[in-house]
Each structure stands twice: as C-alpha cells, then as structure tokens.
Design a protein with these regions (language model features):
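Bacterial Sec-dependent N-terminal signal peptides
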Residues: 1-25
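N-terminal leader/linker segments that initiate helical-solenoid repeat arrays
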Residues: 16-71
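Generic helix N-cap/helix-start motif at coil->alpha-helix transitions
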Residues: 20-25, 165-166, 197-199
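Short coil/linker segments at helix-helix boundaries
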Residues: 32-40, 65-99, 106-143, 153-191, ...
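C-terminal/domain-terminus segments
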Residues: 199-237
C-alpha cells in the first residue's frame, strides 16, 4: 500500500519531467533543422516519438524531413524507403487528427515527391490524391505557405503533361485533374506573400514565369531569391539551379 501511494503521488512529477523533456527535445530539433542539419533534426524528433508516439508536431516534422532527406539520396531503394517513411509518419498524424493542416500538407509533399519519377498513369493517380490533401490543408489553414507551394507544383506538373500522357489518362480515367500554368503562378505568388523566405518557392515561381514568357519577372524573382539566406540543406543546390536558369533566360 505504501509503495502504491508513493507511486501515485510521483505520477504528476513523472509527467512533468516527460513534458519538460519533450519541450527541450522539440527546441533542439527545431534548432538542428535551422542549422541546417536535417539528419540530426530527424533523429531528435524521433526521440520525441519514443516518449510520446502521438506527438503530431514531431510526426509532421519527421514526415517533412524524410521527404527532404530522401530527395537528396542517390540509391533508388533508399530514396523509396524515405518516401515510404514520410507517408507513414503523415498517415499516423492524420489518424490522430484528420483535419490537421500541417499533417495534410506533409502528406501531400510526400506523395508529390514520390510521384516525381513515376509514369504518366501513376502520376495521374497520385495527382488526384495529392489534391485532396492539399485542399484540406489550405481549407484548415489558409496561411500554410507550404501547402500553397504544393498547390502551385500540382498545377505546374498537371499543366505540363505531354500529349501522350494526357491522352492515356483520358482513355484510362475518362478525364484528368485540371491544372494550369496560370493557376500555378497564382499559388506560388500566394505562398510568397505568406512567407518571403521560402527559396524553393521562388525558384518554382521563376520557372513558371519563364515558361509563361514573363522573362523580366523570372529574372527579378531569381535575383531576389539569391539574396535570401539558406534555410534548408537543399537551398544551396536550388540556388545553383536558379543561376543556371538565369543564364539560360539571358
């Protein structure tokens, strides 16, 4: 009885310590991501999930980081493993809260990344699924700049399906999701108005401007982007791609 009472009285302290641990680990995970050291950040957020498997913030972070880290890999199996993990983390978060804006956004990101190298048929199937998640994300948080970026990419990719892909999709499904370059530009611009430090979004917006024959806007966007400090491990490579695009435009 005495042992039981000691245990019961100690429970609030144990929960308090656990909560403090999670707050500290979250701060450290965010710090590592901002360094940026994305592998270390990923491991830190996984530590949180060991303590609290239903921590939605950490599930979302693990999903997003897996999508980013996976994209930089060179081995196809490793790439696929990261993308599967990204979808798994997002899926767990969505089971906890189906309307969580960030969870829907990171699921859309994971699906988008994993469909980049797929065939036309698979790309169309993924496109339908991505649109569901990105629409739900924006509906629940209209200020989610990453979701607007994904919507821009969705429109850009669908608007650029070649004739064979579009014809095959129509034969298979009767219709295909409608995407357009102009809608892509609107979504990318919206993302920039919410967060003006998202380097990938600047690059994709510049590409869209260039494809839409708005050369001056593309050049201005790239030059502005090159002045923004790097925030992710992908940013240096994105800037190099942007410099090459700038030379091509000029």
């Amino acid at each position: 009885m005495k042992v039981l009472l000691i245990f019961l009285f100690s429970l609030p302290f144990l929960f308090k310590v656990s909560s403090q641990d999670i707050v500290g680990l979250t701060k450290e995970g965010n710090r590592l991501e901002s360094v940026p050291d994305e592998n270390a950040a990923f491991n830190k957020f996984k530590e949180i999930l060991k303590l609290q498997p239903t921590n939605i913030y950490s599930l979302n972070k693990c999903s997003e980081l897996c999508s980013r880290i996976g994209k930089r890999q060179t081995n196809n199996k490793v790439i696929n493993d990261y993308y599967v993990a990204a979808k798994t983390y997002a899926g767990i978060a969505l089971k906890i809260d189906p309307n969580n804006a960030e969870s829907n956004c990171v699921m859309a990101i994971a699906l988008g990344r994993s469909s980049l190298n797929k065939s036309g048929k698979e790309k169309i199937l993924s496109a339908r699924e991505i649109k569901v998640y990105v629409d739900r994300s924006i509906k629940n948080d209209p200020q989610n700049f990453k979701a607007w970026h994904v919507l821009g990419r969705w429109n850009y990719e669908l608007g650029n399906l070649n004739f064979i892909e579009r014809t095959a999709a129509k034969l298979l499904y009767g219709s295909i999701p409608e995407g357009s370059l102009k809608k892509a530009i609107v979504a990318f611009e919206k993302s920039n108005t919410i967060s003006n430090g998202f380097i990938l979004n600047y690059f994709e917006l510049a590409k869209a401007y260039n494809k839409n024959d708005e050369k001056d806007k593309a050049i201005y966007t790239i030059n502005k982007m090159l002045l923004i400090p790097n925030h992710t491990e992908d940013d240096p490579a994105i800037k190099e791609d942007a410099r090459r695009l700038l030379q091509d435009i000029k």
